[in-house]
Amino acid sequence: MKRFTFIASLLFLLIGAACTKQKSYIEKEIVFDEGFTAEQKLKLAASLIPTKQQYEWQKLELTAFIHFGINTFTGREWGDGSESPELFNPTDFNAEQWVVALKEGGFKMVILTAKHHDGFCLWPTKTTEHSVANSLWRDGGGDVVRELKNAADKHGMKFGVYLSPWDRNAPSYGDSPTYNQLFVDQLHELLSNYGEVHEVWFDGANGEGPNGKKQIYDWEAFYHVIDSLQPNAVKAIMGDDVRWVGNESGLGRETEWSVTPLRADIHDDAVDENNRLGISAIAKDLGSRKLIEQAKSIYWYPSEVDVSIRPGWFYHPEQDTQVKTLEHLVDIYYQSVGMNSVLLLNIPPDTRGLIHEVDATRLKEFGQYIKETFADNKMAETHTYWKARNGDYKEYKIKEGEIINTVLLQEDIQKGQRVEVFKVEGLIDGNWVKLAEGTTIGYKRLLRFNDVAPEKIRITLIETRFSANISEIGAYYAAPFNEAGSLIELNHIDGEWAEVLQTNPLTVDMQGKNITVKGFTYNPDNKAEMAFKYRFLLSTDGKEWTEPSENREFGNIKNNPVPQFIRFDEEQTARYFKLEVTEGTEGGTPTINPTQIGILTH
């Protein structure tokens, strides 16, 4: 009840601000009184601002994910927890090389997968034997978390940890109180033994453990550990400070509100309330006036765009030629940082324990391109702070003869996010020509258009939530790209089968004779239900079948539907293969088209 009283009192202050010229802002969360009108709710939404931690996080703009662990050495995306710790043995581990490469790319924070779903811990934890302490690396005396944190501190980079609640190795997983205590203990170790941690990242994966049971996570206890040990850290994805953008493709929303009724999972009624509003992390509309009118509460809950520089999240040598091009990375930058989000780009180290040369080179190219593009503001005037209301516009001179193709707009989000619709025009040969238009601005909005040489640009705020505060405007020229994208041959044998014997389960005579088989590939169709769990069998005669791999799932394929490479530990000889889908990404058993499967022969 105290919160409702506070909000009602605050509303009174806001309404009275027109007379007193006082300004009142509220951090992070507002709960609406049942009697509030749509206009009153909107006014409060305009007053909602980030916490200090959220604001400092937003200013980072570029953050890096490091997926490194047992999967690096098994070639999988999701390990099953049965892997031997001895498999983890990087031959030339150098965390400082990671940090230097990231710094050259312009990244301000690095987040390490301290434990992925396989349960293998990259620090010598006291909670399990499944850790670096029982690996061959450094004779069991290594600590990836320590070495990366030391390197980050040395080079002035912020540091975060990813700790997977889903643990496919822990025997106690599924025994909720016991496992929750183990997880709390792991959090304690990570958050109390390595200095300051700036972001703690939880995903929502909750599959079965080694005993076939699922776990009920004690989020409240987990958050309490973070708040008590690292009060300045933001809690991401399953926390209430930073939300997932809703895809792993590097795509932000054209309309991206940091002020949203979307409830984080920290709230007990999150599922019911989000269902009532018809919204989720992947919803297109997360902050419209209509949603706010229907909402019981609103939150400052900004977007983080996570995507990998490669098709997979962990390192796979066959993807060395599939590192995203410079042009693709720049597109992602414009669609994340340039759409009111923070970019979290994954760069997976290889089996040496190094960021591969291809990735490191691409990071350097990316950093140089972004730095050079935004180092030269083509505007003739630099003081651009502007307080505006619906319909207001302002003109800015461009340096004589300068060509531009990019405009930057920023709101002062410490005074709320308020712009709903805007347009950008250029004065060309005496006429105003529309260059770009958009909806939300937020912390930063970047707009691209064809090369022009205007005398002026004009920014018009067509719709705002009361008065908007524009803190920065810039006009820039982004140079064209001169590189082509990389291609990779997906399969060594791809669809050129001697005969398809059966479609469900898919049974194929590969070449009409026995051949060497070293693995297979699956190219998913993300427009239909995809295969998730499967059995892949080989035969020399079509009667007796063997299963060459214990891997029976395409890990993370639902969120990241890229070609899957499954390599066997030992090469096989076979004429026939059979692929049986036991579970699809939506719970069904989809049929696989023969053209989606390829065989790796070398």
Where is each model-derived feature located?
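Asp-box/BNR beta-propeller loop motif
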Residues: M1, L427-V433, S539-P548
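Exposed beta-strand and adjacent loop surfaces of beta-rich binding modules
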Residues: I404, V419-K423, V517, A531-R535, ...
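Mature catalytic domains of secreted/periplasmic carbohydrate-active enzymes
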Residues: K23-D451, T460-P480, N526, F568, ...
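Solvent-exposed serine/threonine-rich low-complexity stretches and specific carbohydrate-binding patches
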Residues: K434-G442, E547-N556
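Extended extracellular/luminal ectodomain segments enriched in beta-structured repeat modules
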Residues: E400-T406, P454, G512-G519, T573-R575
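Bacterial Sec-dependent N-terminal signal peptides
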Residues: M1-I26
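Non-catalytic, beta-strand-enriched accessory regions in extracellular/secretory proteins
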Residues: G391-Y396, T503-D509
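Predominantly extracellular/luminal regions of secreted and cell-surface proteins
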Residues: K296, P480-A498
